[in-house]
Structures are given as C-alpha cells and as structure tokens.
C-alpha cells in the first residue's frame, strides 16, 4: 500500500486492550474509567502531542484513538493517562496493550466496526457502540476532522459488510451447531421447541456469545438457565433478558458455579478469560452428585475456559472450538468477503486523506501567486500613472486569468499525486505537476546539448528561462508538498 495517512505531521495513534490481549479482570478494571469518558478524553488532550481523542469502551475492549503529532510522547501520555484513571501501574498495563499507528490504526477501526475483531465474529452491536463513542467524543469537543472522517468511514464499512455478506450469522451458527451436537450426545433425535424440556443449563459469561447461547437454549425449550459471571450484576442482567423471553433464569457469581454445575445437563462457557474457569476437579465433583448422568460441556472460548481433562471424566462429553469446525466453510467465505470490503474502503479512505493533506499547501501556493499579482499591479500603477481605471482593471482580470490557468494543472496534479502516494523523481514530479507531454524534458535537454557552444545559445535562452522558472516553482512547491505530507521529526518515524 503506497503512503501513510498523516494530517500535516500528525497521524492516527491507537492504544488499546481487548479480550485478545488482556484477562477479563484487567479489562473490567480499566473499563471503570468509562464512567466519565469526556473527562478522560479531555485529559488525553492535555498533552501537546495529541490533538484529537475518541475512546471506544465495550465489555470486550477499551481502545483509545488519538491524532498524534509526535509518536513517542503521544504514546507515553496515553499509557500514563490510562494508568492514572484506572489506578493500575504502567507495568501492569503494558504487557496487555497493543499499539497501531497511521494506516494500521485506520485499518484496525474498520475491522472493529465490521465485527472482524469481535469475540463473536461479525456481531453488529459494535456499530452502535462505535457510533455512541463518536457522539460522546463529539459532544466533548475532542473529535476533529481526522477522527470524524475515520469514524464515519468505519461506520460505512461496517454497514457494507453486514449488508453485502452474511458474516453476522457466524456466531449464531457456531452456537447452533454446538447445541445440535449436544442434542446428539444426549440422545435427542432432532432440534425442536421442546427438545430440552426437563433439562437444565449453565451459561458462563455475559457477553455476546453467552447471550446467543442463552437465546438458543430457550428456543430448544430448556427448563432453566443459570448464568454465571465474574460480575454478578452482568449475570443478572443477561438472566433478566432470558426471563423476558420466557426462559426461567437466574444470575450468580463464579463462587456459586460448582454448586450450579451439579444440576446442569448442558454447560456452555464463553468468558474469554485467561485461565481455567471449569476444571476437571469441578466436573468430577458434579458427576458424583449427578450419579454419572450424561453431561455436555461446550467451550466457545479462545483461549479455552474448560480444562481438556474434563473429557476424561465418565459421563462427560466436551465440545470445544476445535470440535466445532464442521460449520466453518461458509463462515470463511463470508469473512474473506468482509475483509475484501475492508480493503476497498481502507484504500479509498487513504487516498482521500492523502488528497486532503495537500490542500493547505495548494491554498498557500495560490495565495502566494495572488499576492505576487497584487504587488505587480501596484508596481504597474506607479509606473503608469496615466493608465485609466478601466484599462488597469482589464489588465488585472487578464493577469488573474493567467495565474488561474497556470496554477490549475499543477493544483489538480498535486492532489492526484498526493492521493496516489507514489514516490517520484524530481523531473518526473515536475512533468506530472505541469502535465508536460512524455519525453518533452528529454527533448529540451537534447536541444540544449546539441547547441552547446554553437553560437545559437541566445536563441535557446528563452526556452531555458522557462524551464528554469518552472523548476524553481516546482522546487518550492514540492518542498511545501513534502513538508505537508511527510511525518515531521524523529518521533514520527514509526
């Protein structure tokens, strides 16, 4: 991919942690700062290295999107701010943080909005969460042009992915497939609205996948669902949703889980925690109470929640991510299609941003030309006091048209070159800016070489002057362009 997205010398800098990088306990501790996100976002802008800020906070991620004009100072300030607001030390945070800069940060937000980075592949809830984060940051006055454009592009990308693919059915398909397998293990011939009548289940976790499991169990006629989670409030919230859907349910903390396991015919775990949630010892104890009645354990987490050794306990069947690969072909096709859409939107956005980056330089060039024209008109007025106002205005209009014509092509070409993000040589860039015919500069050089010392030098002088003048204009313009579109200083070389 050609070029990087910078606004002047600034670029998007993202620092985050999610279910992929951090344990649930750490995520919960960091997420406590979202009680006053506007205050947090303004704290991020207390440092000169950052000019925009947006914080995306969900149950599975906490991401800090900023626009930084200096990479290292900006990164240090973000980490320090997270540590201050969460009450954690840098040493506790840093092993679990990920950092994306410039184009990579842009691509990450597009992936997030598309559900490609979610615990449940393709889930749509993240679109609303990102929109809410944007509105809150906008209200706090911490979002500028760059993050506005990026967020709107991400929301557009997410909508495209969900309307043009069926990736949002991937998570639901996995849960459905897992429960179909569970029915087979339990000797139930087919799925129906009363297939699990008289059976009880435990769902561990309170995120999107746990919610899907609870919903599917209800559709199969489960008698009762117990939702267990580290945070009891969230377990009770998910249980209340099940009750509203007509499924008897209750929420408990993980400390009550061992007792709940004894009554569960089906256990679905989807916490995303780091470390074992259900051990072989837990299941052995439960089976002693159950007198060996068949029990199906479904582990939908990565890394695993349920210890592999539980599969060796008599009367127990363990289904994990590896066991559920039979439904993946369609999902892979949808994921590939979704990533193709993200790639299209990413390239389009980068081109747009690169083109916008050259606008201030183009405006400065045009202003400089108009200032020079004004000075020349003042000089003309002093030199020709007898010229009528009508003639002077005619000259002024003519000169302005000339300046506009001279600047039109390099202005358009500069935007095209910037959008393309290609590296070109000085002669090629000069030819491109002024849209010179291919080979014209070589022809001029050949004529100059053939006439060297021939006595015809004076005849070529006007042509040489025009080329020299164009080169001088180009050098000045190119210097401004590169200063406007290249990261400034050693802190921006990441």
From Swiss-Prot:
The active site is at 59 (nucleophile). Substrate binds at residues 58-61, 118, 123-125, 129. Its EC number is 1.2.1.70. GO terms for molecular function: glutamyl-tRNA reductase activity; NADP binding. It comes from the Bacteria. It catalyses: (S)-4-amino-5-oxopentanoate + tRNA(Glu) + NADP(+) = L-glutamyl-tRNA(Glu) + NADPH + H(+). Residues 448-494 are annotated as: Disordered. It is an enzyme of class 1 (oxidoreductase). Pathway: Porphyrin-containing compound metabolism; protoporphyrin-IX biosynthesis; 5-aminolevulinate from L-glutamyl-tRNA(Glu): step 1/2. It holds the Pfam family Shikimate_DH. Keywords: NADP, Oxidoreductase, Porphyrin biosynthesis. The keyword Transmembrane does not apply. Belongs to the glutamyl-tRNA reductase family. During catalysis, the active site Cys acts as a nucleophile attacking the alpha-carbonyl group of tRNA-bound glutamate with the formation of a thioester intermediate between enzyme and glutamate, and the concomitant release of tRNA(Glu). The thioester intermediate is finally reduced by direct hydride transfer from NADPH, to form the product GSA. Possesses an unusual extended V-shaped dimeric structure with each monomer consisting of three distinct domains arranged along a curved 'spinal' alpha-helix. The N-terminal catalytic domain specifically recognizes the glutamate moiety of the substrate. The second domain is the NADPH-binding domain, and the third C-terminal domain is responsible for dimerization. Catalyzes the NADPH-dependent reduction of glutamyl-tRNA(Glu) to glutamate 1-semialdehyde (GSA). PANTHER family: GLUTAMYL-TRNA REDUCTASE (PTHR43013:SF1). Homodimer. This is Glutamyl-tRNA reductase.
């Amino acid at each position: 991919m050609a070029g990087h997205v910078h606004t002047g010398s600034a670029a998007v800098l993202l620092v985050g942690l999610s279910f992929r990088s951090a344990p649930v306990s750490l995520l919960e501790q960091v997420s406590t700062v979202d009680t006053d996100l506007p205050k947090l976002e303004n704290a991020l802008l207390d440092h000169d290295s950052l000019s925009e800020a947006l914080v995306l906070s969900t149950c599975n991620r906490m991401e800090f999107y900023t626009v930084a004009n200096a990479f290292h100072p900006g990164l240090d300030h973000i980490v320090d701010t997270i540590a201050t607001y969460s009450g954690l030390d840098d040493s506790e945070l840093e092993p679990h943080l990920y950092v994306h800069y410039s184009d990579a940060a842009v691509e990450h937000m597009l992936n997030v909005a598309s559900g490609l980075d979610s615990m449940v592949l393709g889930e749509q809830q993240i679109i609303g969460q990102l929109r809410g984060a944007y509105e809150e940051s906008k209200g706090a006055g911490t979002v500028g042009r760059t993050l506005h454009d990026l967020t709107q592009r991400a929301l557009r990308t997410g909508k495209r992915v969900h309307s043009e693919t069926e990736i949002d059915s991937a998570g639901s398909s996995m849960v459905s497939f897992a429960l179909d397998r569970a029915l087979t293990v339990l000797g139930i011939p087919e799925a129906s609205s009363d297939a699990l009548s008289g059976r009880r289940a435990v769902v561990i976790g309170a995120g999107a996948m746990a919610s899907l499991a609870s919903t599917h169990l209800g559709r199969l006629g489960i008698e009762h669902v117990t939702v267990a989670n580290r945070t009891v409030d969230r377990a009770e919230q998910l249980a209340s949703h099940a009750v509203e859907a007509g499924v008897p349910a209750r929420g408990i903390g993980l400390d009550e889980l061992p007792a709940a396991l004894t009554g569960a015919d089906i256990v679905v775990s989807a916490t995303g925690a780091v470390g074992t949630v259900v051990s072989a010892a837990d299941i052995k104890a439960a089976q002693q109470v159950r007198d060996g009645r068949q029990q199906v354990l479904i582990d939908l987490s990565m890394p695993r929640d349920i210890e592999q050794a539980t599969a060796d306990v008599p009367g127990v069947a363990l289904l994990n991510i590896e066991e559920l690969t039979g439904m993946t072909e369609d999902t892979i096709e949808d994921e590939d299609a979704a990533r193709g859409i993200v790639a299209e939107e990413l390239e389009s956005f980068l081109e747009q941003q690169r083109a916008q980056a050259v606008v201030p330089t183009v405006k400065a060039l045009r202003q400089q030309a108009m200032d020079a024209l004004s000075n020349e008109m003042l000089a003309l007025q002093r030199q020709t006091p007898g010229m009528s106002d009508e003639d002077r205005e005619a000259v002024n209009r003519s000169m302005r048209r000339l300046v506009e014509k001279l600047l039109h092509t390099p202005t358009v070409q500069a935007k095209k070159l910037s959008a393309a993000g290609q590296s070109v040589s000085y002669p090629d860039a000069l030819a491109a800016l002024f849209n010179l015919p291919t080979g014209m500069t070589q022809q001029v050089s050949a004529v100059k070489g053939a006439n060297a010392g021939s006595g015809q030098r004076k005849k070529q002088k006007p042509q040489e002057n025009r080329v020299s003048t164009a080169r001088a204009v180009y050098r000045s313009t190119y210097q401004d362009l590169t200063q406007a579109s290249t990261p400034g200083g050693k802190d921006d070389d990441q």
